[in-house]
Amino acid sequence: MMMTACDDGRRRVYESGDKGESWTEALGTLSRVWGNNHKGHERGVRSGFITATIEERDVMLVTLPVYSNSNENEKGELHLWLTDNTHIVDIGPVSEKEDDVTASSLLYKSGEANEEELIALYEKKKGDGESSLGMVSVRLTAQLQRVKDVLTTWKEVDERVSKLCPSEGATEDTSTGIACNTVKITDGLVGFLSGNFSGNTWRDEYLGVNATVKKGANGVATGYADGVTFRGAWAEWPVGKQGENQLYYFANYNFTLVATLSVHGEPTEGDTPIQLMGATMNNKNTVLLGLSYDKEGKWQVLCGGKTAKELRSNSDPGTTHQVAIVLQNGTQGSAYVDGQRVGDAPCELKSTDSKGILHFYIGGDGGSAGSKEDVPVTATNVLLYNRPLDDNEIRVLNASKVSIPKLTDLKTLAAGTTGVGTARHFGANGDGSADCGGGLLPLLLLLGLWGIAAS
């Protein structure tokens, strides 16, 4: 693998599977995740970049500076990042805040548990106007333990998600004959929102990017065991909104967003459709791809800000549905309801490369938030993939969806507070071809010829 800083302000990662004869940009995973465009700072800090096997998992460790948004001229604090080529976590700071770091490197020694060592070497300016540089060596004992803790969490969450679709016991969709054991539902799974909700934060179970709850004037978001119920409120899961470092940059090219939802009612006459889930662009908040539900009981696909396709629903309000939106190659969008594609073919989209996705929205988009007629929407088991799932995989996921209890007391919800433990009443039923040549760092980080196989 190879990482380089480019003139467009982002660090690109390239992969080679033929001993360096050809290189392909890793747009679906690590490329363009980290920024290189901090104003008032030199072109870029050379990063440390190594691979290792820790806790029986192939991972990559990277050191790169992190800047706050408040001070454009500040010195970036060097942070350690962990990735397994699917998930990415900021482990935390390595350098001192006053250090003006210009380059860094990592050393990892494996062996028995008490012999493992992770060391960061970084070059810094001495300050006081001096042009000479100094070297610092830091033993990252606490950071290595944090790496192990994160890897343990990833493993545990993988196991939890896998149980949503048991591979044994021949769990099968009787209408399609598709068994859960035909698909590995954690393949390419980057983010997972479930029951970890408090305050205005819906936390990613993989410790990556958290979603933030937004509310209208009368909005309420209420957490329960496995998800959140929104009324006049919604969740935003940031992509471009993350700032300089965008862990979900892959979503501008390929993604699948899946959620189990229940709409506790229907829009009344004259009301706009309920915006259930979608991806909002950076330009004037245009919806790139989304799914809504109208007063006539029809599912509508929003494609490039316009309603493109519809599918009539024969179910009653409060029925549990699994919905999904899929983006392929940044130009083709599809939507699914209960494993069935809405429309016969994908809708054609303009490339997202130049504008970029701002965030995903779930449970609403703020368009009509605050209205007394807002219909509650419950969302649970929200899954974000870094690849487009095919029709078969969508059907398999649908076959394993968990039923959401019906909401019976809307007055209690309206009076509730945001956070875990709020009272809830349920019924008994249960492309990437831009030239980087002029933006290469003096030191190009080339790590031998290896690859991390996505597990």
Where are these predicted regions, by residue range?
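Extracellular glycan-associated modules
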Residues: 164-431, 452-455
